[in-house]
Amino acid sequence: MRLAVVFGRRRYIGRRRTGVSPALTDTTAAPYRLRTDPTVYSVILAVSFCHFINDIMQSLLAAIYPMIKDDYGLDFWQIGLLTFTFQVTASLLQPLIGMYTDKRPLPYSLSFGMGSSLTGLLLLGFASHYWVLLVGAAFIGIGSAIFHPESSRVARLASGGRYGLAQSLFQVGGNTGQAIGPLLAAFIVVPRGQESVSWFAFAALVGMVVLWRVGMWYARNRIAAASRHGAGRELPFARNRIVLALVVLGILTFSKNVYMASLSSYYTFYVIEKFGVSIQDSQVLLFVLLGAAAIGTIIGGPLGDRFGARTVIWFSILGVLPFTLALPHVDLFWTAVLSAVIGLILASAFPAIVVFAQELLPGRVGMVAGIFFGFAFGMGGLGAAVLGIVADIRGIDYVYGICAFLPALGLLTVFLPDMKQARH
């Protein structure tokens, strides 16, 4: 490892004399070393597995909404408030945690974050009042806020320069967990009741052990990584152009996550109300949607490495528009098909968005991950709360009618800079 670091420095010094950008030389030295390290993929898969566990716990909250709505006599706005509590708790803390850990990495905080989510699960399982559900949702949000910035940094460190692939593998664990959550709710929680939610605390314990081991690997490797990337903090564009690009990425994240929040929070109610399916069948349909989103996440990162993040963002945000416009006007079969297509295409955007933002702000991996994961949670939570109020007033059909136009904001991708221009 020391030889690889020294070799990376020599390449950097030599190329600097020929006029090659320090940021580029820094990123070309690191991939060579990482690709020869057999432990890298085990680390990426470990954080992906824990992302899987983390997002199962998150998705259980939304998956039990139909059950607790009946048991507690909740209105749609109260369902939206649960989502809002979870996602806004995560969104407020993630950027702060990311900024702090950019300066002072906390390798073992990953295990602590999983413990917070475990606490939230236990509260959800044994809650007897609505306010306890809110506290449980907040603990799960805190766990996510701690988990995402540091685990995203670990995935990037272990990427070997294939940032899109690493981000996809990391995120697909979460998407798969979100997809399986409704099935677990349908076949375990719904038949056995609310207390069965607490059974999944055992999975959280496994995650804590795995993340402790990941933290040990991270603690050993972060010093060498800091020396490799310390010179690669030069901004690729003028500051005002970077600010504009980040604003555009934020708007695109808003459009994607508000629409996905409308699906994850209210899709089960939509198919129950419009097509008369059972609660269990609605959870299976939600699994189809979220499973397609998991596949989209796998596809998005490698496509970004191959064709560029900007191209993937163009396709994934704007390309989904015809399908969202058609969704409110089709029967049950085509609702299942179109929702799967929508989930697949939209989910392919987020790995590309995160990687693009990290390239705009080199050396700020944790902050960028915290902002965009946190912003995604926050916008999703705010969107769920607002859409819940709209659903109470105008009905679920109306919600999907107005949300269908959100992907049109993908036209703003035209304002994103071409990253190839930053390297010449």
Go through each PLM region and give its residues:
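Residue-level signature of mid-helix packing/kink "hotspots" within the transmembrane helices
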Residues: 59, 87-95, 178-179, 290-298, ...
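Extracytoplasmic gate region of multi-pass secondary transporters
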Residues: 61-62, 244-294
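Helix-breaking motifs and short loop linkers at transmembrane-helix boundaries and internal kinks
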Residues: 73, 105, 126-131, 160, ...
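Conserved MFS/SLC helix-loop-helix module at the cytosolic interface between two early adjacent transmembrane helices
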Residues: 92-131
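Structural signature of the two symmetry-related core transmembrane helices
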Residues: 108-123, 311-325, 404
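Cytoplasmic helix-loop-helix junction between adjacent transmembrane helices
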Residues: 136-173
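Helix-loop-helix hairpin linking two adjacent transmembrane segments in secondary transporters
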Residues: 170-219
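C-terminal transmembrane helical hairpin of 12-TM major facilitator-type secondary transporters
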Residues: 304-353
